[in-house]
Amino acid sequence: MSFYDEIEIEDMIFDADQGILTYPCPCGDKFQIALDDLKDGEEVAVCPSCSLMIKVIFDPEDLEQFEES
């Protein structure tokens, strides 16, 4: 699997209402990944508008900051 980029979780934006993290995609949309998917070990965020994917770099303890939001 090839990734457009590898992004640190700290650089992503958390939407507490939807429970997702986003990051701007070059196509103009946003890469998205659900917090629950990250908890399950998923690390690939996809863009719904194009075929690009990014790898989210994080440690499991990094997720705790979003649960407190």
Curated annotation (Swiss-Prot):
Family, as annotated: Belongs to the DPH3 family.
One GO process term, biological-process aspect: protein histidyl modification to diphthamide
Residue ranges of domain DPH-type MB in the record: 3-59
Keyword Oxidoreductase appears in the UniProt entry: yes
Species per Swiss-Prot/TrEMBL record: Yarrowia lipolytica (strain CLIB 122 / E 150) (Yeast)
GO terms for cellular component: cytoplasm; nucleus
Coiled-coil positions: none
Cofactor(s) demanded: Fe(2+)
GO molecular function: ferrous iron binding; iron chaperone activity; oxidoreductase activity
Binding, Fe cation: C25, C27, C47, C50
Functional pathway: Protein modification; peptidyl-diphthamide biosynthesis
Disulphide bond pairs: none
The entry's keywords: Cytoplasm, Iron, Metal-binding, Nucleus, Oxidoreductase
Entry's free-text remark on domains: The DPH-type metal-binding (MB) domain can also bind zinc. However, iron is the physiological binding partner as zinc binding impairs the protein electron donor function.
Subcellular location: Cytoplasm; Nucleus
Name the UniProt record assigns to this protein: Diphthamide biosynthesis protein 3
Job of this protein: Required for the first step of diphthamide biosynthesis, a post-translational modification of histidine which occurs in elongation factor 2. DPH1 and DPH2 transfer a 3-amino-3-carboxypropyl (ACP) group from S-adenosyl-L-methionine (SAM) to a histidine residue, the reaction is assisted by a reduction system comprising KTI11/DPH3 and a NADH-dependent reductase, predominantly CBR1. Acts as an electron donor to reduce the Fe-S cluster in DPH1-DPH2 keeping the [4Fe-4S] clusters in the active and reduced state.
Catalyzed reaction equations: [3Fe-4S](1+)-[protein] + Fe(2+)-[Dph3] = [3Fe-4S](0)-[protein] + Fe(3+)-[Dph3]; 2 [3Fe-4S](0)-[protein] + 2 Fe(2+)-[Dph3] + NADH = 2 [4Fe-4S](1+)-[protein] + 2 [Dph3] + NAD(+) + H(+)
Quaternary structure (record): Component of the 2-(3-amino-3-carboxypropyl)histidine synthase complex composed of DPH1, DPH2, DPH3 and a NADH-dependent reductase, predominantly CBR1.
